[in-house]
């Protein structure tokens, strides 16, 4: 039996490298590679995109769109890690835990869009609540994200790992202060929101690992923290990669690096003693469940390996 052929278009980048590392030791897949000197050669890329059973696009948005146009073989499937297609109607959103039907949608899809890292945490917290009517779609939501510097873009990665100059090197910074972060559209669509949330991303001096938090005033919702927690527990029951902590087991400190190197996602509900407030929190590796780990999970679904 022929092994499925996998091509990582953009394997030299952070996400591409990590996906390749996760797949390199597998005997059930054949990895196709492009000559490094031709990695921006459209003809060379097209040859591999059309030879592969699944190509994983680890590219900026415009290059990802180009890869789609280059893939003319109807039997070749695409898994896009960029933001280009996450809310496109022809693409299936690659968060298998979104619903009971989502894994099968991914299995059957020709085009799958891998979620963003911040949005993975936010959607994981919000979707079960909006879907059950506990959080109105037009509720004013505030989301805070705290990531290692790999979540802040190429300039920050280069500053920390290659010694290039950057004014925020080594510091804790808030960015995306226009409040129009690129993960907002998918967070709204798949988080079940009709009103734009206020989302503030932040990065620190560690390499990877993140937390995403959503503070809520419960009196405005008319629900308890226990009800929110029960909804999350019900939604993610039996999931391999998502764990909802019991209220009594919540850690006093959330270290964003705890899940580094894994495809795991942990969810927490922190109730205030007065019963009037709660903090929803998600913890994940921004390069794991937020990128390469999720890509491998989606790839396995697309190939019928899980």
Swiss-Prot record:
Is ATP-binding among this UniProt entry's keywords?
no
Keywords noted in UniProt: Amino-acid biosynthesis, Arginine biosynthesis, Cytoplasm, NADP, Oxidoreductase
Pathway it works in: Amino-acid biosynthesis; L-arginine biosynthesis; N(2)-acetyl-L-ornithine from L-glutamate: step 3/4
The UniProt entry, under PROSITE patterns, shows:
ARGC (PS01224)
Q: Where is the active site?
A: 117
What catalytic activity does the UniProt entry give for this protein? N-acetyl-L-glutamate 5-semialdehyde + phosphate + NADP(+) = N-acetyl-L-glutamyl 5-phosphate + NADPH + H(+)
- EC number(s) of the enzyme? 1.2.1.38
**Could you mention a single GO BP entry for this protein?**
L-arginine biosynthetic process
Location comes to: Cytoplasm
> From the Swiss-Prot or TrEMBL record, what is one GO molecular function term?
N-acetyl-gamma-glutamyl-phosphate reductase activity
Q: Which GO terms describe its cellular component?
A: cytoplasm
- Fetch the Pfam families from UniProt: Semialdhyde_dhC_1
Q: What task does this protein carry out?
A: Catalyzes the NADPH-dependent reduction of N-acetyl-5-glutamyl phosphate to yield N-acetyl-L-glutamate 5-semialdehyde.
Protein family (similarity comment): Belongs to the NAGSA dehydrogenase family. Type 2 subfamily.
Query: PANTHER family, per this entry?
Result: N-ACETYL-GAMMA-GLUTAMYL-PHOSPHATE REDUCTASE, CHLOROPLASTIC-RELATED, N-ACETYL-GAMMA-GLUTAMYL-PHOSPHATE REDUCTASE, CHLOROPLASTIC-RELATED-RELATED
Q: What is this protein called?
A: N-acetyl-gamma-glutamyl-phosphate reductase
